[in-house]
Amino acid sequence: MSFPHFGHPYRGASQFLASASSSTTCCESTQRSVSDVASGSTPAPALCCAPYDSRLLGSARPELGAALGIYGAPYAAAAAAQSYPGYLPYSPEPPSLYGALNPQYEFKEAAGSFTSSLAQPGAYYPYERTLGQYQYERYGAVELSGAGRRKNATRETTSTLKAWLNEHRKNPYPTKGEKIMLAIITKMTLTQVSTWFANARRRLKKENKMTWAPKNKGGEERKAEGGEEDSLGCLTADTKEVTASQEARGLRLSDLEDLEEEEEEEEEAEDEEVVATAGDRLTEFRKGAQSLPGPCAAAREGRLERRECGLAAPRFSFNDPSGSEEADFLSAETGSPRLTMHYPCLEKPRIWSLAHTATASAVEGAPPARPRPRSPECRMIPGQPPASARRLSVPRDSACDESSCIPKAFGNPKFALQGLPLNCAPCPRRSEPVVQCQYPSGAEAG
């Protein structure tokens, strides 16, 4: 049989040969090159192999086919073919490898004895007939420790405990060492001793013979727990101090935040108060302007603002002539029952307007029945009807320059009109003569 796809032709002859003698460990073989293996010119050499028992591998034995018969006819036929057992022919002699094993456990001879020993069921039962009478209480009669065995308390044993209790009536709480000593003397367990002392203390309490402070634990345990409580108290105090410091820091931070918030609130309140005060002043100004007898209107022409305020005063009117831009012109009208002032001014702040309104109201509150002399030559008759009067025209010429006359007329906040001259010297720039004030007949007599 050959495998050409691997590149190495194999023959049907056996490739592994084992020696019959058990002492031989290796077979002599000649060296062969790779080319010889590829060509297959040289015969297959014998390879060294450990001698195994042929019964283990079962390559050349007929029992293999019978054993494989349980897997079906195809597998049995394949196992019985000549190609499979031809690869591993071994000698029938048992090798020396298994010589160290126990001879009684050989596969054929020892099989019957081993299975017969397994067939005895009695050897594997843990039950023993000699201990049958102790089936349920097998260890009941066995004393494991004579000293630690539980023993009922008698008068002799309890007398020792009573004597110790009478000696320690002020503190009937035995320590652990004393309990162990009493248990050894009375041959009782430690639990019995502790229970007896607990019952004895309870009886003394009922009989009102209690002469000790109520203590629930021994001195050593109390000391140990006292130390633990002290350490816990120190830790608690430290934690309390840390917590207090943290709380103080938190309070300081919260106080700073509160102060900042309060300052911000105060600033906002001040701003609101300023706005409210300004609003109140504006409202009062509007109310005062509405209560005036004459309308107060503000109109802007270009960049100039003309303010017109009605004041109860003599019949004088100061108007701006159309076509005159150099200076103001003064004219008096007898037909108007009020004093109207027209003057150009720039935008004034609110405080100035409030002061102006206050002074205007002060002028308005003055009694209008007091006529003031304007000039020795110009006088008005209070009873003269306005229709019979002619318009009084004041010339443009004045005794001084316009830039100095207007501040004299309007510079005083009280509007001192008594010093306003209606008769002025001729201006050097104009050649027109001065026009005197003319009144109807009978006006000077009044």
Curated annotation (Swiss-Prot):
Keywords: DNA-binding, Homeobox, Nucleus
Basic and acidic residues: bias regions: 217-226
PROSITE patterns with a match to the protein in the record: HOMEOBOX_1, HOMEOBOX_2
Pfam family membership, one: Homeobox_KN
Chain intervals with Acidic residues compositional bias: 256-273
Protein biosynthesis in keyword set: no
Compartment annotation: Nucleus
Gene Ontology molecular function, alphabetical: DNA-binding transcription activator activity, RNA polymerase II-specific; DNA-binding transcription factor activity, RNA polymerase II-specific; RNA polymerase II cis-regulatory region sequence-specific DNA binding
SMART domains: HOX (SM00389), IRO (SM00548)
Single GO biological process annotation from the record: neuron differentiation
Residues annotated to bind DNA: 146-208
Annotated spans, Disordered: 208-273, 362-394
Keyword Cell wall biogenesis/degradation assigned: no
Role this protein plays: Transcription factor. Binds to the iroquois binding site (IBS) motif of target genes to regulate gene expression; functions as a transcriptional activator or repressor. Modulates expression of RCVRN, VSX1, BHLHE22/BHLHB5 and TACR3/Nk3r. Required downstream of retinal bipolar cell specification for the terminal differentiation of type 2, type 3a and possibly type 6 bipolar cells.
Family recorded in the similarity comment: Belongs to the TALE/IRO homeobox family.
Protein name per its UniProtKB record: Iroquois-class homeodomain protein IRX-6
Organism: Homo sapiens
Encoding gene per record: IRX6
